[in-house]
């Protein structure tokens, strides 16, 4: 359970950074 929790937290953090990066790219390249 602990290992899965850490893995999930890490994946969630990476996903959040990725989404934030996409949002920033879209904002910068928007009209």
Swiss-Prot record:
Matches recorded under InterPro entries: DH2-like
GO function term, MF aspect, one: G protein-coupled receptor binding
Tissue expression as described in the entry: Detected throughout the central nervous system in fifth instar larvae, particularly in the medial and lateral neurosecretory cells and the dorsal unpaired median neurons of the mesothoracic ganglionic mass. Also detected in nerve processes over the salivary glands, dorsal hindgut, anterior dorsal vessel and dorsal diaphragm, and at the neurohemal sites of the abdominal nerves. Not detected in the nerves directly innervating the heart, alary muscles or posterior dorsal vessel.
GO cellular component, one term: axon
Superkingdom, taxonomy of origin: Eukaryota
Keywords from the named record: Amidation, Cell projection, Hormone, Secreted
Residues bearing the modification Proline amide: 31
UniProt record, GO biological process: body fluid secretion; positive regulation of urine volume; regulation of heart contraction; regulation of hindgut contraction
Entry's localization field: Perikaryon; Cell projection, Dendrite; Cell projection, Axon; Secreted
UniProt key word Manganese: no
Keyword Lipid biosynthesis annotated: no
Function statement: Regulation of fluid secretion. Stimulates primary urine secretion by the Malpighian tubules. Increases the frequency of contraction in the heart and hindgut. Causes a dose-dependent stimulation of cAMP levels in the dorsal vessel and hindgut, but not in Malpighian tubules. Has synergistic effects on urine secretion by Malpighian tubules with serotonin.
Family label: Belongs to the diuretic hormone class 2 family.
Protein name: Diuretic hormone class 2
Source species: Rhodnius prolixus
């Amino acid at each position: 359970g602990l290992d899965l929790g850490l893995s999930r937290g890490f994946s969630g953090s990476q996903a959040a950074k990725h989404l934030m990066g996409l949002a920033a790219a879209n904002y910068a390249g928007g009209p």
